[in-house]
Amino acid sequence: MSEIRLYVSTTESQAEQILDLLTEVFGEEDFAIGTTEVDEKRDIWEASVYMMAEDEAQVRSRVETALKSAFPDAQLLREVIPDVDWVVKSLEGLKPVRAGRFLVHGSHDREKVRPGDIAIEIDAGQAFGTGHHGTTAGCLEVIDRVVRSRRVRNALDLGTGSGVLAIAVRKLKNMPVLATDIDPIATRVAAENVRRNGIASGIVTRTAPGFHSTAFSEHGPFDLIIANILARPLIRMAPQLAAHLAPGGSVILSGILAAQRWKVIAAYSGARLRHVRTIWRNGWVTIHFDRP
């Protein structure tokens, strides 16, 4: 069944106001909500809500009712989202993805790497994370900022999947990285991708559910912790994750729907971390915290 995007094309300021309105309307329901910049020079942004086709009628009715009272001149537009599974899609269909200075590409696109690119080679396979999903791309952008601007001597990639984020950290800076996942297939795939990218000596991969492994005490505490999983486990693990963060360290979290962001921020603020920034990509958010 197709996914539908209902959106309003407007200015950045109004897009953020509409986003707040949509968040109030849908609360903790599983509808992705977000804003996207379309044209920087002309200040064109889109505020969007995503749903499956079967939910469109009721979502449209609720959005139109909310807009009518708060933004009567707003025009609600519609787009059908192509049904694409990037993990199992054929290699020929996967285009290189740029996120900050990173270029994530498959083995079939090596010739597209340009001078100055930080290239990460990941082929589609059994483990999630090829750079095409908004959560992965958002993490890559924040990783680039954090490693460039802060003192980072070691890192943890929790829920590593394909290993793309661990590889990104290691390619930015020569430091030890621990990459863990609950799924042994993902751990094996991550190790293979680490070797493929020529940095096997700098990344340790381990199969571990949550923080239940001696690897965390052996390699931590960490100056940087990245966890691109889901909002509920992130909220549940907030105290444990914060306990493994070194003084002055940074945390990058994703796998979070826009409507879920406030609960995640509250959980990590409660763990005495400071919210630094939130970035948006296609209805998903990536949140950066630090320990003051």
UniProtKB/Swiss-Prot annotation:
Catalysis: reaction(s): L-lysyl-[protein] + 3 S-adenosyl-L-methionine = N(6),N(6),N(6)-trimethyl-L-lysyl-[protein] + 3 S-adenosyl-L-homocysteine + 3 H(+)
EC number of the protein:
2.1.1.-
One biological process term from GO is:
methylation
User: Do you know which InterPro entries this protein is assigned to?
Assistant: Ribosomal_L11_MeTrfase_PrmA, Ribosomal_PrmA_MeTrfase, SAM-dependent_MTases_sf
Enzyme class (EC, first level): transferase
Locations listed in the record: Cytoplasm
Among Gene3D superfamilies, the record links this protein to:
Vaccinia Virus protein VP39
Tagged with keyword Cell wall biogenesis/degradation: no
GO MF term set: protein-lysine N-methyltransferase activity
Q: Does the keyword Protease apply?
A: no
Q: Cellular component terms, GO, for this chain's entry?
A: cytoplasm
Residues where S-adenosyl-L-methionine binds: T136, G159, D181, N228
Listed A to Z, the keywords are:
Cytoplasm, Methyltransferase, S-adenosyl-L-methionine, Transferase
Sorted alphabetically, which SUPFAM superfamilies does this protein's record hold? Answer: S-adenosyl-L-methionine-dependent methyltransferases
Tell me which family the UniProt entry assigns to this protein.
Belongs to the methyltransferase superfamily. PrmA family.
PANTHER family referenced in this protein's UniProt entry, alphabetically: ELECTRON TRANSFER FLAVOPROTEIN BETA SUBUNIT LYSINE METHYLTRANSFERASE
Described purpose of this protein according to its UniProt entry: Methylates ribosomal protein L11.
**Can you say what this protein is called?**
Ribosomal protein L11 methyltransferase
Gene name as annotated: prmA
